[in-house]
Amino acid sequence: MCTTLFLFSLAMLWRRRFTNRVEPEPSRVDGTVVGSGSDTDLQSTGREKGPVK
């Protein structure tokens, strides 16, 4: 029984972690609509810096 409770608690923790990771993605989509230019600039800048180094 202790093992079952332990596994159940681990499953709940993993679900919470995955849920937290999934939630920001839709928020980024909403943010992308508002500041898509800023997000694109940051990504392109990061890509340019990589090859230069």
From Swiss-Prot:
Q: Out of the domains of life, which is the source?
A: Eukaryota
* UniProtKB keywords: Cell projection, Endoplasmic reticulum, Golgi apparatus, Lipoprotein, Membrane, Palmitate, Sensory transduction, Vision
Q: Where is this region: Disordered?
A: 24-53
Q: In which tissues is it expressed?
A: Expressed in retina, where it localizes to both rod and cone photoreceptors (at protein level).
Q: Which molecular-function annotation in GO is an example for this chain?
A: opsin binding
- Which InterPro entries does the record associate with it? PRCD
State the post-translational modifications.
Answer: Palmitoylated at Cys-2. Palmitoylation is essential for protein stability and trafficking to the photoreceptor outer segment, but does not appear to be essential for membrane localization. Probably palmitoylated by ZDHHC3. Phosphorylated.
This protein's record includes keyword DNA repair: no
Q: What is its main location?
A: other
The listed locations are: Cell projection, Cilium, Photoreceptor outer segment; Membrane; Endoplasmic reticulum; Golgi apparatus
**Feature: compositional bias, Polar residues:** 35-45
Which topology term describes how it sits in the membrane? Lipid-anchor
Q: How does it assemble?
A: Interacts with RHO/rhodopsin; the interaction promotes PRCD stability.
By sequence similarity, the record places it as follows: Belongs to the PRCD family.
Q: What does this protein do?
A: Involved in vision.
Q: What name goes with this protein?
A: Photoreceptor disk component PRCD
List the taxonomic lineage.
Eukaryota, Metazoa, Chordata, Craniata, Vertebrata
